Design a protein with these regions (language model features):
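Juxtacatalytic substrate-recognition/specificity segment
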Residues: 57-185, 192, 202-206, 214-222
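Beta/coil-rich, acidic/histidine-enriched accessory regions frequently appended to metallopeptidases
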Residues: 23-25, 259-426
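Bacterial N-terminal signal peptides
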Residues: 6-14
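Positively charged n-region of N-terminal signal peptides that target proteins for export
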Residues: 1-4
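Short, low-complexity intrinsically disordered segments enriched in A/P/G/S/L with frequent Arg
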Residues: 17, 21-22
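Generic detector of solvent-exposed, compositionally biased contiguous segments
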Residues: 27-46, 93-98, 198-226, 325-333, ...
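Acidic/His/Gly-enriched intrinsically disordered linker/tail segments
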Residues: 140-147, 162, 166, 181-243, ...
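Acidic/polar low-complexity interaction segments
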Residues: 27-74
Length: 426
């Protein structure tokens, strides 16, 4: 398993080192950098010797001397410069730097040099988890152990692969975000970094998407710097981008508020929240997202429940109910999702009584017809109790599929209990 270190908040105390000025020619320049040794936790600050192996319009590429030619090559360096400066899978005329800065904003420019330092160095593993790259926030401070410059670190194993170029885009958003909001909640920062990968054309975290779609009960919202579902973050931020557009994304990054409040405040500053009544909110968009993950059809509701910027490998896992009456006692995390699917035969009537322990309990009922997707209907029920009735209109259109998506619209420390009782009349 590979993991990204993006926004760690460790307190590091270490003796500083003299910093050399940035290179100004394409000739190799030697210097020392502070970096993290991540093969133990919390990570330790260590110093490595590196040589500049390439200079682009927006970056310097340094390679740890012990990794040069084993395994890092000049071809790797050249490809990284090409991707960062000039060309990405999303746009052959735009590099990672241009796409990211247009979408999210400018990097901090800690040292007064607009170029970004890229350090390629073997990162290794910790307890079976391989590290791919990180933005080391300490470099944006004047503390001991800081390089005092804008720098990203990428693992030395195949550093110019599409996967690691995606990591570079991901970590670059973290660097940009530091300039605007150093206190942002981790799940928001990770969501925007995953979006940066998608905007640059690196859908290389698809395995995280697949994991989430198999386990959608993993919460999107992890307050503070709690455990993050990268799959949920990627799918959420991309859906928000497709719904609200690039202008909103820029406001979201620059909004000084954090978490859900910051999201809602950002909407108020953009066209996304102007002239629309009621204006969208985090919770209303989350409800639509629950439906979009299942439907993902541009032909339904004028594309309200569909992705434009990516394709889903498959739909979310659903628990199927095939016999009646049926009862389900379960739990769902705040901003996690459970999907329960019922088959409604022709001329059938499905009744569902729902009750839960939280007033934030939300149920989205999705009615679909396999023969005619235009007949898809969505209804919403919120509160501790709900009585849901789905009538198949006398069976005119044949069998109907009914999916109940359940969540709690509040962050919770523990999952919330709910109960569903379903009956079928024919």
């Amino acid at each position: 398993m590979r993991v990204l270190i993006g926004f760690l908040a460790f307190s590091l105390f270490i003796v500083g080192a003299g910093l050399k000025p940035a290179p100004t020619t394409a000739d190799p320049v030697n210097r020392e950098f502070w970096t993290w040794y991540v093969q133990k936790m919390p990570p330790e600050d260590i110093m490595v010797k590196a040589t500049c192996r390439g200079i682009g319009q927006n970056l310097y590429v340094f390679v740890n001397d012990v990794d040069w030619l084993r395994p890092v090559t000049q071809a790797d360096v050249d490809r990284i410069i090409e991707a960062f400066d000039r060309s990405t899978p999303a746009d052959p005329q735009k590099g990672i730097y241009q796409i990211a800065t247009e979408a999210f904003g400018l990097p901090p420019d800690k040292d007064g040099d607009p170029k970004i330092y890229i350090l390629i160095s073997e990162l290794g593993e910790f307890r079976g988890h391989h590290f791919d790259g990180f933005f080391r926030y300490l470099d944006q401070t004047n503390e001991k152990g800081s390089n005092q410059l804008d720098m990203l670190c990428v693992d030395a194993h195949d550093p110019a692969s599409e996967y690691h170029l995606g990591v570079l885009a991901h970590e670059f958003q973290h660097l940009i975000h530091w300039r605007y909001d150093q206190e942002e909640e981790g799940w928001v920062n990770e969501a925007l970094s995953e979006l940066c990968m998608i905007l640059c054309g690196y859908y290389t975290d698809k395995r995280h998407v697949e994991t989430f779609l198999k386990h959608t009960d993993r919460p999107l919202v992890a307050p503070g710097h709690g455990a993050t579902s990268y799959g949920a973050c990627l799918l959420w931020a991309t859906y928000v981008y497709d719904r609200l557009g690039p202008e909103f994304i820029g406001w979201w990054v620059r909004e000084p508020g954090q978490g859900i409040k910051g999201f809602d405040d950002a909407i108020k500053h953009t066209a996304a929240g102007a002239g629309v009544k009621p204006a969208p909110t985090f919770n209303s968009l989350f409800a639509d997202w629950m439906v979009a993950l299942y439907i993902n059809d541009p032909g339904v509701q004028n594309g309200l429940y569909a992705y434009k910027s990516l394709s889903l490998p498959f739909g979310p896992f659903c628990e199927d109910v095939t016999s009646y009456p049926s009862e389900r006692e379960a739990e769902v995390s705040g901003y996690g999702i459970d999907y329960i699917r019922f088959s409604l035969p022709a001329a059938g009537r499905l009744g569902i009584i729902a009750e839960g322990d939280s007033p934030g309990l939300l149920i989205e009922v999705i009615e679909t017809n396999k023969e005619d997707p235009s007949l898809t209907r969505v209804s919403e029920h919120q509160g501790k109790e709900a009585n849901i009735l789905v009538d198949n209109n006398g069976g005119i259109y044949g069998e109907k599929e009914v999916v109940v998506a359940v969540t709690v619209l509040e962050a919770t420390e523990k999952p919330v209990r709910y109960h569903l009782k379903a009956t079928l009349e024919q």
